[in-house]
Regions:
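C-terminal catalytic/motor cores of large multi-domain enzyme assemblies
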Residues: 1-225
Length: 225
């Protein structure tokens, strides 16, 4: 239970919960890593057509991330004790905010799930977080994390890696922007994706290739996967 300490008219101090203490330790560890971030703008026209009942834009992003990560294991990796471990299994963590703080439940084996399967699993773990019923197994084993603040109206941001993971993807809001398409100015639903990486585990070229693969999938696929 969260405790409150009365400090008079200036306000109150709140002791950190166990979950918050763990997050503080993880974020402190993250700041010891040499991090870099790269950003790409993606046209979400095709991605928006893949939404359906029970399938959100976040689900589409998670599904295409899983496919791109399977092709680029240098991003689907951990760094620990001067060792880089690249994974064939794609276990995507999704940052979820609740009254209890920030939790990162994991969709295990995401590379083997359909879009509908990812949507169902995402809905399940988010509901468990919001209800305070998340289990230890639900937050263990992540190989990559996605943080989406687009629904909060945040255009672009840089996320901090979730150690020992090698990278984290920050997704901003999808908004209409004027872009040039084959020489013509057009209004398109654009979204900024920022990838933060641990330079000890990967490099800018590998990060750019992953984002290019993700961009290609989101911009060209118009059918559920």
């Amino acid at each position: 239970m969260t405790s409150m300490i009365d400090i008079g008219t200036t306000g109150t101090a709140r002791a950190l919960t166990k979950t918050e203490k763990l997050m503080v330790r993880a974020m402190t560890t993250a700041w010891t890593a040499p991090m870099f971030a790269i950003v790409v703008d993606i046209d979400m026209t095709a991605a928006q057509t893949r939404r359906a009942e029970g399938v959100t834009l976040t689900d589409v992003i998670l599904a295409d991330c899983a496919a791109a990560l399977a092709q680029h294991p240098a991003i689907n990796a951990h760094y620990r004790d001067e060792t880089v471990v690249q994974f064939a299994e794609v276990n995507i963590g999704l940052a979820v905010a609740s009254d209890r703080g920030l939790t990162v439940p994991v969709i295990h084996g995401a590379q083997g799930l359909s879009l509908a399967g990812i949507a169902a699993r995402r809905a399940e773990i988010v509901a468990k977080v919001r209800a305070g019923k998340i289990a230890i197994a639900d937050v263990m084993g992540g190989t990559f994390t996605v943080s989406n603040l687009g629904m909060r109206g945040v255009r672009q941001f840089t996320a901090i890696i979730n150690p020992p993971q090698a990278a984290i993807l920050a997704v901003g809001s999808t908004e209409m922007r004027q872009v040039w398409n084959n020489g013509d100015p057009q209004w398109r639903p654009m979204c900024s994706f920022s990838l933060t990486c641990d330079h000890r585990a990967t490099d800018g070229a590998q990060a750019a290739r992953f984002l290019a693969a993700l961009k290609a999938r989101l911009e060209t696929s118009t059918t559920p996967s």
